[in-house]
Amino acid sequence: MTKIKICGITRAQDALEAALAGADALGFNFSRKSPRRIDAETARSIIAGLPPLVTPVGVFVEQSPEEINDICRHCGLLVAQLHSDDYDAEKTLQIKGVRVIRVFRPSPGFEVSQVRKFTEKTGCRSFLFDAYSPAMAGGTGQSIEAQTAGSLFDETRDFSWALLAGGLKPENVGDAVTLIRPWGVDTASGVESGPGIKDALKIRQFVEAVRKADRSLTNCC
């Protein structure tokens, strides 16, 4: 089944709604520039109340590896999502005690070989492909062009677990799963009524759209 990550959690009630709807992972954004920014104490409190088998993921843009390690340990995060090109192989290897998801935002001239080289240097095999925007690291609601996304996943499938992000919402995530077949999907703005405020109905619709696509793939293959 396609894994589902609901990102930009800022409230305990939203975290619980997402977990009950069937989300596999929840994202907590620590970027100082994000409208979905959460502080460490609030994140820690929410994570402590999560049901078992729901994975808490920290999203980092500006923090140093040392800061990431401290925040992950304090909050009980299990995964660090590195959402900036500043996190090169050297910095990634300094992150300890958690799994790493490295984000790539394909811009003009991007080559898949960059992803493979990153794996060779770090051993990291978990990636997230998000739409490129010079103004914001993520959560823009913009989508990766379909042909580009298809090529990315086809060319990285043999050595990675990759999630698709960027503009996904209940109305289009089913088609994305069917056409691209990512290992997982990630959404923030696609299930919100406002930045950082999740819409419980949209979350349930998003999860059901993914599961419906999963069933169609199972039945056709």
Curated annotation (Swiss-Prot):
GO terms for biological process: L-tryptophan biosynthetic process. Pathway: Amino-acid biosynthesis; L-tryptophan biosynthesis; L-tryptophan from chorismate: step 3/5. Keywords: Amino-acid biosynthesis, Aromatic amino acid biosynthesis, Isomerase, Tryptophan biosynthesis. It catalyses: N-(5-phospho-beta-D-ribosyl)anthranilate = 1-(2-carboxyphenylamino)-1-deoxy-D-ribulose 5-phosphate. It comes from the Bacteria. GO terms for molecular function: phosphoribosylanthranilate isomerase activity. Its EC number is 5.3.1.24. InterPro entries: Aldolase_TIM, PRAI_dom, RibuloseP-bd_barrel, TrpF_fam. Belongs to the TrpF family. This is N-(5'-phosphoribosyl)anthranilate isomerase.
